[in-house]
Amino acid sequence: MSLLVKAGNGRIDNDGIVNVANPSMTELGLKHISFGLLSLQGGEPRTIRTGSMEMAIVILGGKADIMWTGKNGECRAIVGERPDVFSGKAWAICASPGSEFTLVGNADSPRVEMAVVRSLPLEQAKSFPGAAPGVTIVDPSMIGVRQAGRDCYLRTINDISSAAEGRGLTRLIVGETFNPAGNWSSYPPHKHDQFTE
């Protein structure tokens, strides 16, 4: 089994998301989570439907306009402001199952690049009350930053998903980890692929 997955080999789904890793890629051994990439040119629209999945979209670089119907009617926001992942904290969109929204590449941004993470919500795996359909915008001021590890595995973690806890995400843990040059991300090497109560 190769752990090398090339984004260019991914299939494009109906929402225009390039699937990089998902449960249908049996060689990866994934059961619940999918990872993909979405890129929009300025002015290019894309309607996203979460279906039965919960979803987090992290703006890697550029800006997008988002439109959705909330509890009080039509909602609109501009998400993203950094040119790349090394230029500050991210913006993110967290959406619960049954949600629908439209993203449009912002006219001020020639291109917006996004990482898309999807999972079956926790209530489909265990008995757990699900979130109502909806969209939560996470702006950089909401993202907690912490240091983890020490010595050669010291890293900075920007925790995106805790800002949306209870508002759309029940299973996904989403964030960005920045390691000083030469450092490891964690020690000892490990993984988190089993549900524990």
Placement of each model-derived feature along the sequence:
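Fe(II)/2-oxoglutarate oxygenase catalytic core
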Residues: E27-H32, T47, M55, D65, ...
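Glycine- and acidic-residue-biased ligand/ion/polar-headgroup-sensing regions
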Residues: G51-A77, A181, Q194-E197
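Short acidic-glycine-tyrosine-enriched beta hairpin
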Residues: W68-G98
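Hydrophobic alpha-helical segments and helix pairs
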Residues: G88-R150
